């Protein structure tokens, strides 16, 4: 069977069961798009910016666990993918990014739209390839999908020169298996280490489970639930772990860290045994590392040995797949009765994990999230967010019940992530309700994707919490920089030293999100007072197709609790 490099690419996507490709064309990938013209059973989504293609591939992967795929041309097209690739790398998301490249004979000559993508992407990919011979292409594609989706997942980049994409391979056959001598992830945890972990858990007086995105990647939520209930241990989840354990369960104590619950942070500081599963002890969780969990011995279950004892000292490491390890651990452990530790947790917890000052004089952003939760909690909805205050309020007030229902940028914290990610999630899970919760700052980073959403009639429901600020940066300026709001007001511009707040500003706020939505043939709705919130949400959520719902929220509302950077996590600031 004879095929060109471009045709091999199309067949590889079919062999790997890829059903959606997020792409933008250009000169060096014309042969690939020519082959795509005849592709069957593959939906090609033409984005409006390559960064959005990478984030959409992430959204697809985060919603399904399958490998997401994006395609861009050489030079600026490829470099525009890098932010999304870096985002996937930080959050361990499996994507394959395919980039065009100048012909092999031109590489190194500073040719038109040439960029060293292998060099640029090396720090933010799990692996990358520059294909120099069409005979290598079938093997490279097979390896790329395997590497992206196995072990600790992550992005893989394939840089494909134009001459390779038009070259012909005689006797083409797609490989049935992969053999990479230098890559062999440990899947099964060592039995002796699992036994040691079980013994430490049995002897613990104050056990605490701290789980993260690795539980979701592994598909280990059921096993995590079994462990928690069996040993009656409170559960705290990292931002990436939300949904791995039911948010309304009595053992759940919220997210820890900078904007985590006081209950979770207190528990981390008082526990004598942390059972950590698929987490990396990010600085936003630990706060001042030297003061983190001072009384605890830490058991760390993770598929990536490089994460163990990288940030905090671990007493018992267990390397392997979280699901396999938890299955083995659950077989050994017996049940544990409710103890004084559980009673202490419940005292800290009180009636609710997070609270804010309610008001009907303005729209509180937390209230919008709470109402969105009440309206969607029984609909198996997927909630995406951008990055900023709204992201933290969503993590605090939306009680995620299942894995792969919260999709957000964690490690890189990428503004502009949510809108394209929600496109990818909606296309990955047709028929499911998908929301994108955004701030007025973040949404404008990739707002051009409203065109992609409109043209493809992707039924994403977009909630914009418009406080007319870059809210999270403004909050830091408010709390730590004497309210010097430099370049954070989205109404007035760079510096308004006599500023009395958006309500007193003579400058008109732009854009008008309702009219902007309508210009893309998308339903646009706006709430300007407390009483508008439920009607606007109801109309938007019940509408056919995509909808933009803008809420004019309290401008200078802050996210609390807040642990100042570098401080111990039990020294959080609270709302005055």
Give the residues covered by each predicted segment:
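Short acidic loop-to-helix transition motifs that present clustered carboxylates
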Residues: 29, 50-55, 390-392, 529-533
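Short beta-strand segments
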Residues: 159, 384-386, 550
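Generic enzyme active-site microenvironment
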Residues: 157, 300, 384, 437-438
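Active-site diphosphate/adenylate-binding microenvironment
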Residues: 9-10, 14, 32, 36, ...
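N-terminal alpha/beta PP-like core and its mobile active-site loop of ThDP/TPP-dependent enzymes
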Residues: 1-336, 371, 375, 459-462, ...
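Flexible, glycine/charged-enriched surface loops at secondary-structure junctions
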Residues: 153-156, 335-348, 361, 548
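Short glycine/proline- and acidic residue-enriched helix-loop micro-motifs
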Residues: 124-127, 179-182, 346-361, 498-500
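Thiamine diphosphate
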Residues: 98, 106, 112-113, 309-311, ...
């Amino acid at each position: 069977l004879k095929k060109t490099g471009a045709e091999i690419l199309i067949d590889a996507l079919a062999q790997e069961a890829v059903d959606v490709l997020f792409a933008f064309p250009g000169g060096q990938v014309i042969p690939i798009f020519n082959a795509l013209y005849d592709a069957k059973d593959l939906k090609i989504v033409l984005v409006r910016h390559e960064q959005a293609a990478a984030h959409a591939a992430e959204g697809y992967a985060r919603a399904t666990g399958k490998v997401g795929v994006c395609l861009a041309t050489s030079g600026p097209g490829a470099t525009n993918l890098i932010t999304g690739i870096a985002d996937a790398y930080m959050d361990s998301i499996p994507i394959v990014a395919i980039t065009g490249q100048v012909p092999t004979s031109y590489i190194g000559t500073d040719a038109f739209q040439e960029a060293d993508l292998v060099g640029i992407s090396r720090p933010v990919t799990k692996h990358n390839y520059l294909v120099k011979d069409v005979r290598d292409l079938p093997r490279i594609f097979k390896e790329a999908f395997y590497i992206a989706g196995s072990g600790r997942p992550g992005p893989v980049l394939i840089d494909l020169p134009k001459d390779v994409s038009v070259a012909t391979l005689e006797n083409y056959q797609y490989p049935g298996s992969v053999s990479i001598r230098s890559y062999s992830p440990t899947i099964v945890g060592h039995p002796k280490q699992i036994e040691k972990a079980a013994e430490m858990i049995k002897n613990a007086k104050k056990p605490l489970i701290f789980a993260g995105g690795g539980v979701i990647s592994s598909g280990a939520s059921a096993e995590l639930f079994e462990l928690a209930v069996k040993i009656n241990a409170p559960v705290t989840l990292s931002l990436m772990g939300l949904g791995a354990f039911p948010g309304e369960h009595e053992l759940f104590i919220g997210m820890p860290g900078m904007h985590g619950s006081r209950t979770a942070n207190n528990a981390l500081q008082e526990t004598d045994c942390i059972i950590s599963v698929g987490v990396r002890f990010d600085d936003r969780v630990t706060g001042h590392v030297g003061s983190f969990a001072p009384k605890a011995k830490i058991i760390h279950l993770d598929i990536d040995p490089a994460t163990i004892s990288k940030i905090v000292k671990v007493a018992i490491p267990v390397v392997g797949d979280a699901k396999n390890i938890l299955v083995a651990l659950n077989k050994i452990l017996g049940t544990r009765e409710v103890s004084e530790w559980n009673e202490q947790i419940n005292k800290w917890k009180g009636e609710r994990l997070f609270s804010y000052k309610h008001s009907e004089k303005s729209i509180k952003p937390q209230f919008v999230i709470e109402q969105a939760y009440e309206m969607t909690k029984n609909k198996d909805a997927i909630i995406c967010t951008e990055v900023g205050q709204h992201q933290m309020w969503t993590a605090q007030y939306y009680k995620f019940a299942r894995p792969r229902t919260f999709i957000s940028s964690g490690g890189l914290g990428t503004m502009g992530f949510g809108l394209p990610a929600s496109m990818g999630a909606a296309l990955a899970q047709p028929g499911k309700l998908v929301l994108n919760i955004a701030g007025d700052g973040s949404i404008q980073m990739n707002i051009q994707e409203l065109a992609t959403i409109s043209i493809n009639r992707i039924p994403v429901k977009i909630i914009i919490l418009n406080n007319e600020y870059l809210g999270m940066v403004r909050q830091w300026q408010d709390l730590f920089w004497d309210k010097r709001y430099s370049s954070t007001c989205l109404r007035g511009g760079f510096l308004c030293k006599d500023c009395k707040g958006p309500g007193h500003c003579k400058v008109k706020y732009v854009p008008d999100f309702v009219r902007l939505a309508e210009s893309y043939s998308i339903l646009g709705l706006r709430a300007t007072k407390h009483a508008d919130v439920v009607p606007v949400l109801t109309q938007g959520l019940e509408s056919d197709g995509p909808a933009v719902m803008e809420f004019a929220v309290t401008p200078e509302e802050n996210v609390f609790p807040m642990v100042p950077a570098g401080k111990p996590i039990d020294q959080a600031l609270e709302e005055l």
